[in-house]
């Protein structure tokens, strides 16, 4: 079930959300250090992680699923968000270079179809980055944050799902190794706990970050089934 966009925004407006965004942005940037000239699409509630690419990527757009709702973004300039069904993206085939999924895979009732649609809009060799709640983490079991909603995953589950829809996993990282508590002193120490956790406790990180590439050859993913709208 998709979370309400207002609840997602409220989380990222709080100190714990700002801390999570700062730490997770760093892992995303480490995997995608330069998107100059790339066409970037965020799907789900990815806008907290897209701003760092404004002015660098050739084009940035954000799709928020209809069941979630939409928020205008960015605050300044022309709006870059649109509302759409996650299995019927409003983009031509092979028109996107990079896709970032955040608060998406775990919420969709049709995750395989959604990945099939991402495969369709990505160009040859295009890259997909997934941020999903880690089933083994405390974050995935506490509903006080968005990462505690929906279906959490293991790395193996995500890898198999990606391969079944025509993607080759390339890189894996972890983030959010501090516990999801809102105590101010705890959050101030979060960067330090993140460094310690990355050394010793990565299996229990809050989220799994996986980069994958669109595979052009071999088995092609089935076309998503179009469902009649009510």
Predicted feature residues:
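Conserved class I S-adenosyl-L-methionine
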Residues: 127-152
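Class I SAM-dependent methyltransferase SAM/SAH-binding core
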Residues: 34-89
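A short glycine-rich, Lys/Arg-flanked "PGG" loop and its adjoining helix->strand segment in the class I
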Residues: 112-127
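Conserved catalytic loop of SAM-dependent methyltransferase domains
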Residues: 170-195, 203-205
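Hydrophobic beta-strand segment of the Class I
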Residues: 99-100
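Class I SAM-dependent methyltransferase Rossmann-like catalytic core
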Residues: 1-34
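C-terminal lobe and adjacent flexible extensions of AdoMet/dcAdoMet transferase-like proteins
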Residues: 194-230
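Short alpha-helix
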Residues: 149-172, 176, 208
